[in-house]
Each structure stands twice: as structure tokens, then as C-alpha cells.
């Protein structure tokens, strides 16, 4: 979150910008050029277009502070864009289409940043869907909301929510919508029902960075451990820290009754994970309870915006090709002795304290609103001073991570690639 000091600095910069505008109209034109270049960068999808737009931004920005401000302000969003019920498909590298329906408020205003909510359906053991949105069998009118963008992707028997192809597709769909719609990056939530609820657990355990909160309904995290269901994952409850959950299960659910989920809830409590657990009295495998529960659910979302760059971050990973990042930390190399690697990082001013277990190398991503780049940054790993130096901010680093995330609150001007001392 933006610190008070940075807010004051921003107000000062705004005042200076206004003064300069009166005296030197050329600066305003430069900002206009920056807005257009950022828009081109935001919308570029091919490697060639991305490379070209990145080079143009580097050439146009007089310094990294200006480039950061341009990216933080974001692209220009058009009012001439689809509203109401829309449908599209993300096409994977192997040609597989991943269709999704998205619902845009009829009075969508591009000047407003909208919360965005994904809704994952149940019943994933079905053939691949044809276009038309039939995967959401309850009708889309019930999902339409004037204050948010709703996204309903499709899952089927070759693409369960917890399969690798969906782990790639869901973030890609989110980025596709962010290219053209003004999304509040800190209010993107993931909700799911039945198998969709289990899918929500998957993203909470493995890919939480871009989500504010997770809402699994009548699902079960234990399914993710089952290798026959395409999962076979090891679940690390430390990965759920900093991302709250709203969990609902019925007492008489024929598939996932409260009694079967209760051991997982106990672990959440022991680990200190922020969560709400609602056990529906006499509830079955349905969402008949939803009208009564909705006010509390909506308040939960309001109360839990994402903190994109928390001071303390923990991540546990058993691989480094994927599922190895949380916010501004990444595990790059494990010891290879079958133990999962655990990385615990705390930031206090320019001092970073790291605890690393079963890890050989890791990366720290640095944001200029959290660190003073005019002073040395110190990193202490397992009690040993490992790094202390003035860190140089790089435009290309900023743009590379901006391209990956398309997130105006996850902007990094430097990265530290560090090894764990013996």
C-alpha cells in the first residue's frame, strides 16, 4: 500500500506538474505521449509488439521516476467498448480454446476502477464446451452486478481448475481483460462452487499474487492431493497467509460435509490464516444458503482489499518452474533433497531479513515506494549479512515485470538475485 510519505510526495509532484504545465506546455505533451505509449505497451500481446513498445517507452521517458509514474497512472481506457454479457476465448499455445463469459456493467465508466470477480463453476468432468456459455447453468442474469466486472471461465475433463493449463489460462484471461477495462488491481477476487470451490483452493495455495481474497463454496482442498484427479499436490498452509478466505460448506453435503472439511479449518486456525468458515446447518451440496449469506460475503470483500506488497511474506514451494512466487519474493533454486523450500521475508525500511530453508537461491523484487534507493539496501539471510549496497533502478526491469503482471500496484524497478549462504 502507498505510504503516507509517498502520498505527500505525490501531492507535491502533482503541484509541481501543474506549475510546470502553466510555464512549459511541452511537459504536458510529454505526459500525453507517455499515456499513449503505456496504452500501446498494455495492449501489446505479440513478442514483437511488446519489444517495440518497451523500447519506445525507454526512449521516451527522461528518467525511471517518470516511467514509473506513467505506469502507475496506467493506460488510457476507452468508453467505446463492449458492455453487458460478452464472450471470448483465450487460445493456448497448443491451439486449445479456453472460453469465458464476462459481464460488464451497462453503465461502465472507463474513468472508474472496477472490482473484478471470477466465478468458477462446478461439474468439471464433462466434455469440452462449445461456445455459448452453457458451462454456467444457472443463467448469467443472477451474476450481473452494476459495481463490478464478473468473469465466468469454462472447465472440462481435460482442463480441471487445478490442472496446469488452467493455472496458465486464468491469469491470462485476467490480463486480457485488464488490457481494455479499468480493473481495480487490489479488488480482484476468486469465487467457486463445488469443483470450482476446489479450484479456488488451488489458486490460493499455488498462485495467490494477483488475488485479494478467495471464496470457496462447497469444495474441498483435499481433492488437490489426489493424484488420480490430476492434482497430487502437496499443500502448504503457510502459503495462505496474507490472502483471506471465505469458506462455506453444508453439514449434510453428500460430497464434502462439514465434518470432512473441519480438519483443514483447524489447520487454518493453527497457522493463523485469516478466514471465515460458515457451516450451514442441515445444508446439502447446493447454494440455497447464498441469499442469506450474501450480505456477509459482500462485506468480507469490502473489508479485504489486497495488500500487494506486504511487509512480511512467506512462501513454500516444491518446484521452481512454476508456483514459486508470492508477491515480491520468488524461490529460484531448491536444495534438491525432496524437502520443500520455505522462504520467509520481512521488510523494515531498507533492511530485509530472510529465513530460507531448503533453498539455494531466491529473488527479491523491489518497489520504489517501499525502499529508498538513495540509501544502501541490506539483506540478512539466516542471520548472515548477505548483501549491502546502493541498488540501481533499471527501466527494463520495471517494464519486464509490468509486462508480466499488468498490475499498477506490482511495479518493480530492481530485482535482487541472491544465494543462500552455507
Where are these regions (language model features)?
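C-terminal beta-sandwich/jelly-roll accessory domains of carbohydrate-active enzymes
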Residues: 316-422
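Short beta-strand/loop motif that positions the catalytic acidic residue
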Residues: 240, 246-249
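Active-site machinery of serine-nucleophile hydrolases
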Residues: 116, 120-179
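Gly/Ser-rich "nucleophile elbow"/oxyanion-hole loop immediately N-terminal to the catalytic nucleophile
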Residues: 106-112, 159-195, 205-211
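Bacterial N-terminal signal peptides
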Residues: 13-24
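Primarily recognizes the serine-hydrolase "nucleophile elbow" in alpha/beta-hydrolase
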Residues: 186-239
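C-terminal catalytic histidine-bearing segment of alpha/beta-hydrolase fold enzymes
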Residues: 254, 258-352, 357-358
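A domain-start/cap signature at the N-terminus of enzymes
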Residues: 29-114, 385, 393-411, 422
Amino acid at each position: 500500500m502507498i505510504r503516507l510519505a509517498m502520498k505527500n510526495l505525490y501531492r507535491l509532484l502533482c503541484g509541481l506538474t501543474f506549475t510546470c504545465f502553466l510555464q512549459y506546455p511541452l511537459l504536458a505533451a510529454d505526459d500525453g505521449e507517455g499515456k499513449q505509449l503505456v496504452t500501446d505497451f498494455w495492449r501489446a500481446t505479440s513478442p514483437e509488439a511488446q519489444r517495440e513498445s518497451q523500447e519506445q517507452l525507454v526512449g521516451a521517458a527522461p528518467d525511471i521516476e517518470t516511467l514509473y509514474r506513467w505506469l502507475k497512472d496506467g493506460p488510457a481506457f476507452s468508453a467505446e467498448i463492449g458492455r453487458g454479457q460478452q464472450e471470448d476465448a483465450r487460445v493456448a499455445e497448443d491451439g486449445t480454446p479456453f472460453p469465458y463469459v464476462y459481464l460488464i456493467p451497462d453503465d461502465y465508466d472507463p474513468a472508474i476502477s472496477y472490482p473484478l470477480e471470477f466465478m468458477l463453476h462446478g461439474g468439471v468432468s464433462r466434455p469440452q464446451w462449445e461456445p455459448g456459455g452453457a458451462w454456467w447453468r444457472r443463467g448469467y442474469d443472477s451474476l450481473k452486478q452494476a459495481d463490478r466486472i464478473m468473469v465466468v471461465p469454462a472447465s472440462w475433463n481435460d482442463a480441471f481448475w487445478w490442472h496446469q493449463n488452467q493455472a496458465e489460462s486464468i491469469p491470462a484471461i485476467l490480463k486480457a481483460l485488464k488490457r481494455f477495462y479499468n480493473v481495480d488491481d487490489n479488488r480482484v477476487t476468486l469465487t467457486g462452487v463445488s469443483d470450482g470451490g476446489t479450484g479456488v483452493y488451488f489458486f490460493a495455495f499455488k498462485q495467490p499474487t494477483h488475488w485479494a481474497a478467495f471464496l470457496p463454496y462447497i469444495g474441498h482442498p483435499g481433492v488437490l492431493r489426489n493424484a488420480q484427479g490430476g492434482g497430487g499436490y502437496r499443500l502448504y498452509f503457510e502459503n495462505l497467509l496474507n490472502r483471506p478466505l471465505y469458506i462455506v460448506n453444508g453439514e449434510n453435503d453428500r460430497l464434502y460435509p462439514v465434518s470432512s472439511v473441519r480438519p483443514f479449518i483447524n489447520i487454518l486456525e493453527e497457522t493463523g490464516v485469516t478466514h471465515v468458515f460458515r457451516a450451514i446447518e442441515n445444508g446439502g451440496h447446493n447454494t440455497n444458503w447464498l441469499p442469506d449469506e450474501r450480505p456477509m460475503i459482500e462485506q468480507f470483500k469490502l473489508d479485504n482489499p489486497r495488500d500487494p506488497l506486504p511487509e512480511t511474506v512467506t512462501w513454500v514451494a516444491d518446484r521452481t518452474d512454476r508456483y514459486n512466487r508470492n508477491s515480491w519474493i520468488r524461490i529460484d533454486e531448491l536444495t534438491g533433497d525432496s524437502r520443500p523450500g520455505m522462504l520467509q521475508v520481512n521488510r523494515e525500511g531498507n533492511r530485509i531479513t530472510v529465513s530460507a530453508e531448503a533453498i539455494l537461491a531466491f529473488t527479491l523484487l523491489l518497489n520504489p515506494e517501499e525502499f529508498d534507493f538513495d540509501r544502501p539496501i541490506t539483506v540478512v539471510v539466516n542471520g548472515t549479512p548477505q548483501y549491502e549496497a546502493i541498488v540501481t533502478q533499471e527501466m527494463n526491469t520495471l517494464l519486464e515485470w509490468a509486462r508480466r503482471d499488468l498490475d499498477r500496484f506490482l511495479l518493480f524497478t530492481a530485482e535482487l538475485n541472491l544465494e543462500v549462504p552455507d
